[in-house]
């Protein structure tokens, strides 16, 4: 029996996307690597973010709309005492300020206050569109437009770690929740300035990163 072409296979690949790559770029590279006819992902991760990006191939692309509505989990690392124009590590530093000593009981109280249904204003540096233009394209030109708040739900925020100038949080949230906005809002309640140093999506509902190959290992993983 001859080898089965991957182009005829259907399924979902949990790709461990690296930082610095757009979700669409990861999708197209995986589609080409696996020689798939149809491919789609289940919701973009920011280029800065790393972690699990479910990729649907061929007949499995019909599942993507259901996965888009699933809850998300993120590990968020935030640098304190620095603010950037984008709210994350990709932006230009606008201001630096001393970081006061962390008060963990007060911090936990603040975190609890940011759970539940909330209205969140999307950041300018996002892929949302305004009159046909991506917001990040306008932001790079120095243009800021009004963004209506959108309802999202933060189910849980846990303090995973902390240091003199950073916080590490595990966030369980609904789709469409912007971690940079959530982080800035939380830290503004305790500290003057902060930015998101990095974000990792460690799992998507049940799956964990242990099941997800990086892009370079996608083909042997899929074939296995």
Curated annotation (Swiss-Prot):
Biological processes, Gene Ontology terms: mRNA pseudouridine synthesis; tRNA pseudouridine synthesis
The keyword DNA repair belongs to this UniProt entry's keyword annotation: no
Keywords for this protein: Isomerase, tRNA processing
Any Pfam family matching the protein: TruB_N
InterPro entries listed in its UniProt record: PsdUridine_synth_cat_dom_sf (IPR020103), PsdUridine_synth_N (IPR002501), tRNA_psdUridine_synth_TruB (IPR014780)
Keyword check for Repressor: no
Catalytic center residues: 46
GO molecular function terms attached to this record: RNA binding; tRNA pseudouridine(55) synthase activity
Enzyme Commission number, as recorded: 5.4.99.25
Top EC category: isomerase
Catalysed reactions, as listed in the record: uridine(55) in tRNA = pseudouridine(55) in tRNA
Entry function: Responsible for synthesis of pseudouridine from uracil-55 in the psi GC loop of transfer RNAs.
Assigned protein family: Belongs to the pseudouridine synthase TruB family. Type 1 subfamily.
PANTHER family linked to this entry: PSEUDOURIDYLATE SYNTHASE TRUB1, TRNA-PSEUDOURIDINE SYNTHASE
HAMAP family the UniProt entry points to: TruB_bact (MF_01080)
Protein name: tRNA pseudouridine synthase B
Organism of derivation: Methylococcus capsulatus (strain ATCC 33009 / NCIMB 11132 / Bath)
Gene: truB
């Amino acid at each position: 029996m001859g080898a089965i072409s991957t182009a005829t296979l259907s399924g979902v690949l949990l790709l461990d996307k690296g930082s610095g790559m757009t979700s669409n770029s990861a999708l197209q590279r995986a589609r080409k690597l696996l020689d798939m006819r149809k491919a789609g992902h289940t919701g973009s991760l920011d280029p800065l973010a790393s972690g699990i990006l479910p990729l649907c191939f061929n007949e499995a692309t019909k599942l993507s709309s259901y996965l888009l509505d699933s809850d998300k989990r993120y590990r968020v690392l935030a640098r304190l005492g620095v603010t950037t124009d984008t709210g994350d590590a990709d932006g230009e530093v606008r201001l630096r300020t001393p970081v006061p000593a962390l008060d963990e009981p007060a911090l936990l109280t603040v975190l609890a206050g940011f759970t539940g249904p909330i209205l969140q204003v999307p950041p300018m540096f996002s892929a949302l569109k305004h009159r046909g233009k991506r917001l990040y394209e306008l932001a790079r030109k120095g243009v800021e437009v009004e963004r209506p708040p959108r309802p999202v739900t933060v189910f849980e925020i846990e303090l995973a770690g902390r240091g003199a100038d950073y916080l590490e949080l595990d966030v369980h949230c609904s789709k469409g929740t912007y971690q940079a906005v959530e982080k800035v809002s939380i830290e503004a309640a305790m500290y003057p300035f902060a930015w998101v140093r990095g974000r990792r999506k460690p799992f998507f509902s049940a799956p964990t990163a242990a099941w997800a190959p990086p892009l370079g290992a996608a083909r042997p993983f899929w074939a296995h």
